[in-house]
């Protein structure tokens, strides 16, 4: 199991958990009252459960030459979206950043 903190405008908003490469969970912090991660992931008390890597996070990953460079330099498997997100998570476009919990 791997975990990451999800920040919105620098405030911890949620936790992303990879149970295995086919099972993911996104839990908002119980006292979080700020903006949602995205329109498709509004703030709620119950966790979101996914049977694949969450689309929002897949959508912020690099593509093309940038992806190939990331995979090569960080020695990441192309199918390991969680590791890709951890590699670029603090430098995403927009208000969301992601940092691995070690």
PLM features per residue range, with description:
Residues 1-102:
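Phosphate/dinucleotide-binding and metal-coordinating scaffold of catalytic cores
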